[in-house]
Amino acid sequence: MKRIFLKGIKGGTGTTSIVANLACALRKSNVPVYAIDLDPKGDLGLHLGLAWEHLLGWSDYPDFASACEQFHQDNDGVRFLPYGSRSNLGLDFSSIIESCQQLNDSDDSWFLFDCPAHVDVHRYPLNEDDIFLEIINCDAICHSFAFKRLNALKQAESSWQHYFLTNKYNSASELESDLLQLWQSELPLIAPLYINKDEVIKEATAFRNVAINCAPYSVANDDFETLAGWLVSRASQNAQ
């Protein structure tokens, strides 16, 4: 069981689209992939084909067994669990994370958690084999937050693998190019890859789909395939 947590260092970094596209990229290897929406302000299901009017999710149920009724499967075979209508009848995100252990039907299973930006990293029940990706954009706010996070991680002596992943990178922007070069040279834990800004990601969502399905020859497809391969490599090192 491989657990990947993805969280924006602030709101609007594009975390949910990464979760959806990454899930579909991993699924291409014909392994079980689960995507869990922990964000009350997110809409992971929309990226994976869920009907616009669907409102129910795990937060509408008192226990995990009944919440499993809301698991859906997209055309690629990704199983996903929406957040729901925010009624919170008894479950919280920590119990959902822990309860997913019950679904672990294979050592090759991947569990991707779409985490809300406002919940601090240290509130998640993380294990030493977990990988936590904190999503950043090339702007001054993320730059400030990333170095603050780095200091907090050092003080907490975190045991999990923590990385900063750059999303929506625009190579035509001088500021973004300068920031990315600075991070790559001076920011520890920066992932050795980034996701380029690509209009197809937004267009795919309008069709309730992901970029790697709508535009298999796009830059976005290459980026998510690269991200999936890198995570497979990181997870394999954990298993050794």
Question: Over which residues does each language-model region extend?
Answer:
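Conserved beta-strand segments of the P-loop GTPase G domain that flank and frequently precede/overlap
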Residues: I36, P82-Y83, L112-D114, L133-C138, ...
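Inter-motif core of Ras-like GTPase G domains
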Residues: D120-A140
